[in-house]
């Protein structure tokens, strides 16, 4: 079987079954395990699939955006570990940006209010947590997305112009070596771009499920931010560590 034929067969199997095992592909193609692994690596780089332990899986819909309830209940343990690590990076007097999202929301619980930190955020859900923690903050104005509680749009971009940050902490829907960091909403991508540009240090908080995924709108290249994630048996970070810093937390 020629390589293009084999690649198409793999793509077809993933479209049909969502997840496919390496051994199943070996049986279907009569190719060696090393050949199938190379095929999966190539197809992942091209954005056709993402590799998982023992095989490959279908990518999510590039425009699909889960709501806050769905996000908050998914991979909670990983998100808490990532949030704790991110909060540990904060220093006395830091001015930071917290993106709207569940992991950045969890960060607030781990923040030390005695460090005199000032927060700028576009997260409506972050308001109560920041007030309870007695942390000084500024809320961007603009259009509020009902599904996620994120404030976006022209007004929020204009408001961002007046701020400069020591550190920005952002969520993402996709992390990919070639496509970079991506999100379903182009308006939200613009705000994330500005948050990275106006920070001395930018951090993307991503649990392992985000790796290999590509969403509709890119907001940064893979080398534009440090990644904070958790260790995962089925995932290797070698390709990412060639292009950026990856801080891996033990789950």
From Swiss-Prot:
Residues 20-39 bind DNA. InterPro entries: Carb_Metab_HTH_regulators, DeoR-like_C, DeoR_HTH, NagB/RpiA_transferase-like, Tscrpt_reg_HTH_DeoR_CS, WH-like_DNA-bd_sf, WH_DNA-bd_sf. Keywords: DNA-binding, Repressor, Transcription, Transcription regulation. Residues 3-58 form the HTH deoR-type domain. It holds the Pfam family HTH_DeoR. SUPFAM superfamilies: NagB/RpiA/CoA transferase-like (SSF100950), Winged helix' DNA-binding domain (SSF46785). GO terms for molecular function: cis-regulatory region sequence-specific DNA binding; ligand-modulated transcription factor activity. GO terms for biological process: regulation of DNA-templated transcription. Gene3D superfamilies: 3.40.50.1360, Winged helix-like DNA-binding domain superfamily/Winged helix DNA-binding domain. This is Uncharacterized HTH-type transcriptional regulator FruR. It comes from Bacillus subtilis (strain 168). The lineage of its organism: Bacteria, Bacillati, Bacillota, Bacilli, Bacillales. The gene is fruR.
């Amino acid at each position: 079987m020629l390589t293009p034929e084999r690649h198409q067969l793999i793509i077809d199997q993933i479209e049909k079954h969502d997840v496919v095992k390496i051994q199943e592909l070996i049986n279907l193609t009569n190719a060696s395990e090393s050949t199938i692994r190379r095929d999966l690596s190539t197809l992942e780089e091209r954005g056709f699939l993402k590799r998982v332990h023992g095989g490959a899986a279908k990518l999510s819909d590039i425009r699909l955006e889960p709501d806050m309830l769905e996000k908050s209940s998914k991979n909670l343990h990983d998100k808490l570990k990532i949030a704790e690590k991110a909060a540990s990076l904060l220093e006395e007097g830091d001015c930071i940006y917290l993106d709207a999202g569940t992991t950045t929301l969890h960060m607030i619980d781990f923040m030390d209010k005695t460090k005199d930190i000032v927060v700028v955020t576009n997260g409506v859900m972050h308001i109560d947590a920041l007030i309870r923690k007695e942390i000084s903050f500024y809320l961007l104005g603009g259009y509020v997305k009902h599904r996620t509680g994120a404030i976006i749009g022209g007004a929020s971009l204009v408001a961002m112009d007046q701020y400069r940050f020591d550190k920005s902490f952002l969520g993402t829907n996709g992390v990919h070596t070639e496509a970079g960091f991506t999100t379903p909403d182009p308006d939200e991508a613009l705000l994330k771009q500005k948050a990275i540009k106006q920070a001395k240090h930018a951090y993307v908080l991503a649990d392992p499920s985000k790796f290999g995924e590509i969403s509709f709108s890119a907001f940064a290249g893979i080398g534009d931010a440090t990644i904070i994630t958790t260790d995962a048996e089925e995932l290797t970070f070698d390709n990412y560590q060639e292009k950026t810093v990856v801080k891996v937390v033990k789950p």
